[in-house]
Structure formats: C-alpha cells, structure tokens
Amino acid sequence: MALTKVITGVTDLNQAQSTNGLKFPTGSVFAGTPEEGMIRNDQSQSSETSSSTMQFYNGTAWKNFVNKTPIPLGSDNFNTVLYTGNNGTQSITGVGFQPDFTWIKARDNGSNNHALTDSVRGTGSGNGLSSNTTGAEGQYSAAYGYLSAFSTDGFTVQAGSTSPNFVNSSSANYVSWSWKAGGAPTATNSAGAGNVPTSGSVMIDGVASTATLAGSIAATEISANTAAGFSIVSYTGNGSTSQTYGHGLDSIPEMIITKNTSGSEYWPVWNKDLTSVNYFLYLNTTDAEGDGVGTAFNSGISSTLIGIGSSGLVNTSSQNYITYAFHSVAGYSKIGSYTGNGSTTGPTIVTGFEPAWVMVKRTDNTSAWNIQDNKRNTTNPRTSVLQASSSDQEYTSSTYAINFNTNDFQIVNSDNGWNTSGGTYIYMAFAAT
C-alpha cells in the first residue's frame, strides 16, 4: 500500500504566518510574506457561491481561481454516422446524443438530394429540406423519403414512395451528420418581441427560457446550445427593412445559414470573413460571394441578434424561415478563412483540435461547398468529398485530398475548390472528440 508523507515546511495546511510550501490557511487575509505557488482562502473577498474566495499567489499578486467552462466534447455535440438503407423504416443509432439537426446524403447515387431535418421545424414527411435545391420544406420528402423521428441515440428514417430515396434506398450507402442544439421546443411562441416567450418555445441548453424575446421580429421557436455555439431559430418575416431577431447564443455568430421554408428560395449564407457584413453566399449554388447591400444580412448581427433586410431570401412578409447559427468554440469548433497557394503542399489551417468534419467554400470565385469527414475516410489523406450544393454522389480522388492532423487540417491539393493560388476560402470545422 502506497503512503503519502506530509512534511512540515513543505506542506503547511494551517499556519497563518508560515511562508513555506503549499498553503491552505483558514483565517482572514494571510499576513505573512507570500511565495509563488501558495494558496489561501481569503475571507475578505466574496464569490457568487461562497462567502470566501480561494486564491493563489503568482509571484507578484494574489489571484482568484476562475471557473472555466469545460470544452464541449465533439462526440457529445456533433457526430457522423454511416448506414445502409433498407427501403423501409429504419432506426439509426450510434450518434451518442439526441440530435436537433441531422443532415443526410446518399454516397453512391447522384440523383439523391441532401436531406436536412431539425427539431425546431419537426420531423416527418412535411419537413425535409435539401441544401442543393430551392424547394420549400416537405417538397420532396413524402415521395423521396424523410427523417421521421429523433431518438436518444439517433433518428429514424422512412423510405419514400418514389425512387431514388434520399434517406433509405435498399442497399444504398448514406452518411449522416448530426448536431445537438438546445432540445426540441414543445410549443410555438405567440408572444411579441420584447415579451416573455410562450413556455417551451425557446429552449436554451435544454431549459425553457423565460427571458424576453430579443429583436424586432419575435422568433417562433429557438433551440440553442450555448456551450457548443450552435442554435436553430424559426421566425416569420414581416417584409420591413433593418429588422433583427434573437439567435439564443451568447456570442456573435460567425456562420449563419437561412432558408425560406414556405416557398422556393435560395439558401443565403453569411460568414464573418466575407468582404463586408452585407456580403453573402448561397449554399445551393457554386456562386462567388455577392453584395446584398443590406437587403439580406446587415450590421445588426451581434451577440444576441441577427440583422436582416427586406429581401425575400430572409424576410418576405408572412413567410416562414429557419436559421442555423454557429460560432467557434475553443477545442470543439472553428470557423475561419484562408488563402490558397496553388501547391499540393497547401495551407495548414490551425483549428486547435483534430477535425472530424470540415466544409470549405471558395468565396472570390465559383466553387462547390466541399465536405470531408473522418468516417468516410478514416486515415490521411482524406479524399472522399460530398458537396452541399450538388446532388452528385461522393467523389473519391486525390484531387480533393486534405489531411486531418492533431491540431489542424492541411490542404494537400491544388483544386480550385480548395487551393487556387491567391483564392480566398471560408471553412467550418468540428472536432473528433
């Protein structure tokens, strides 16, 4: 049995005037001469949860210990799951949490649209969206398949009546990407902006919010995971200029994806690293960035609000919209930009973690929205690409190769969609663990 010795002068637990070793005094302010590494309980201070504060001496001054928010585990908030279709009803497990947003794509059929479903709009045949089309929600779901339910460890898919099935064709291979937000709302908000929302309509970190609704447009439902920097917001447009609505996060979003769910509209995407706050991209096209002159997104984007104009892309009167908002979280997610060098030894993009999923888009010229993950390719180089803007099947080629490393990802190709010399690119990445 191992023993631990406590030696006087090295570890001093309760002698107010000693200046040696590790110190845990219980009196008031320590009056002796401090030494670096000492710890004290300063009863003249106060904290949010205690009448006294633990402090440490850094060699110059006494400093309070500060609680740090734990870094979210990637596997608790994002996961990729592969599955094979059965042309019926199928429960997909292994996600590791109950998703609030799941994005599905067939890997081996170029006629299959993407299928995006979230807990705010709900599941079922009337709620699917496709990132590669302008269609309203549910336009393709009943015929081509849909996600019918979220569960504690995944989701259920239902084949449609028409081939090809977007989510569950017999023997077809699929990839699913799932994110955790704040839980499924249990009600639709009927309160106006500035008022307390209908109970259960705004879910922040799994709890129904009682805070007043931010913005000039009252969100109808919100699901936000503040620790993971991801929220889902539904709202109804009013057709007016210079409007705002709350996003439910506690930091400024760095990537905002919006879709008119009532009608046929493009998918505008705002990113912090575009030319200006008025610029945006389209998720469903390969187009370069464009200037919306404030009619789409505008300077109203803040730590509580998303600012929009009167464009039909984001704010037609009486039309319904869905927004997916993201910001970087150290150790879990990173949203940023880089400049290509045109070499197969391309830029190394520091993320602070090993990526599990990366999406890249060139902004100054046409290119697809390229997606790589660590489940379709388990080792470097990662060469299997799906494109959010296309129904095309998975491409596997060294032309699209990138490496996932412990602290970054590196572009190891010179393709236009990844690494043209002088080209500007945005990316969003999520951690493996």
Task: Give residue ranges: language-model regions.
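Hydrophobic residues embedded in beta-strands of well-ordered beta-sheets
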Residues: 46-47, 52-54, 62, 155, ...
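Extracellular/surface-exposed low-complexity repeats and stalk/linker segments enriched in Gly/Pro
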Residues: 4-47, 66, 74-89, 231-240, ...
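Assembly/interface hotspot detector across virion components, adhesins/toxins, and nucleic-acid enzymes
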Residues: 3, 10, 55-57, 147-148
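Generic structural signal for beta-strand residues in well-ordered domains
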Residues: 15, 32-33, 47, 55, ...
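Tryptophan-rich substrate-binding surfaces of secreted polymer-degrading and adhesive proteins
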Residues: 58-68
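Short hydrophobic/aromatic-rich beta-strand motifs
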Residues: 23, 30-57, 100-105, 256-258, ...
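Surface-exposed molecular-recognition determinants
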Residues: 67-433
